[in-house]
């Protein structure tokens, strides 16, 4: 195999593509003593931006609510530009859906924690995420759950 045919996977750039913080009920919300319910949503997406160059965005949305009130909403779009070349077609999607988000996640976690604390709240520490499991689940959903065959 020639040098230019070797598989290439590299990080070109990491950056925050989107950062949004909302505290719609400030300052009154800071007087509340009740613990809010925290909901975390993750989404990943990727697109080609050049020959063998892909942008992958990991979006983390954290919403803290009390009954009938939003405490805060933080959304971080942590992005990266990745060079992926000479990789078999069947390996490209798993790289974009699993490997790239695994690289982006620590940066997104730090951005979320920082944004929440700068908004005046205790930092949120995001637990590690199984992106491979999320990818496999999405593949199963796209393929449709296999019909169960009764055992006789």
Swiss-Prot record:
GO cellular component: cytoplasm
Record-level Gene Ontology MF annotations: unfolded protein binding
Keyword set includes Transmembrane: no
Key words of the record: Chaperone, Cytoplasm, Protein transport, Translocation, Transport
A Pfam family: SecB
Subcellular location: Cytoplasm
InterPro entries the UniProt entry points to: SecB, SecB-like_sf
UniProt-listed GO biological process terms: protein folding; protein tetramerization; protein transport
Annotated disulfide bonds: none
Subunit structure: Homotetramer, a dimer of dimers. One homotetramer interacts with 1 SecA dimer.
Family membership: Belongs to the SecB family.
Function: One of the proteins required for the normal export of preproteins out of the cell cytoplasm. It is a molecular chaperone that binds to a subset of precursor proteins, maintaining them in a translocation-competent state. It also specifically binds to its receptor SecA.
Xref: NCBIfam families: PRK05751.1-3, PRK05751.1-4, PRK05751.1-5, secB
Protein name: Protein-export protein SecB
Lineage: Bacteria, Pseudomonadati, Pseudomonadota, Betaproteobacteria, Rhodocyclales
Gene designation: secB
């Amino acid at each position: 195999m020639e040098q230019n045919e070797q598989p290439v996977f590299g990080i070109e750039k990491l950056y925050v593509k989107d950062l949004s913080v909302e505290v719609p009920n400030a300052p009154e919300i800071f007087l509340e003593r009740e613990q809010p319910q925290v909901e975390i949503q993750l989404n990943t997406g990727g697109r080609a931006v050049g020959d063998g160059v892909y942008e992958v965005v990991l979006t983390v949305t954290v919403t803290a609510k009390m009954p009938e009130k939003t405490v805060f909403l933080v959304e971080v779009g942590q992005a990266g530009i990745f060079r992926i070349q000479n990789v078999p077609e069947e390996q490209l999607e798993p790289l974009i859906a699993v490997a790239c988000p695994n690289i982006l996640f620590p940066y997104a976690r730090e951005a979320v924690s920082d944004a929440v604390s700068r908004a005046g709240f205790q930092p949120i520490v995001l637990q590690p995420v199984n992106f491979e499991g999320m990818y496999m689940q999405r593949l199963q959903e796209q393929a449709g759950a296999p019909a169960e065959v009764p055992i006789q």
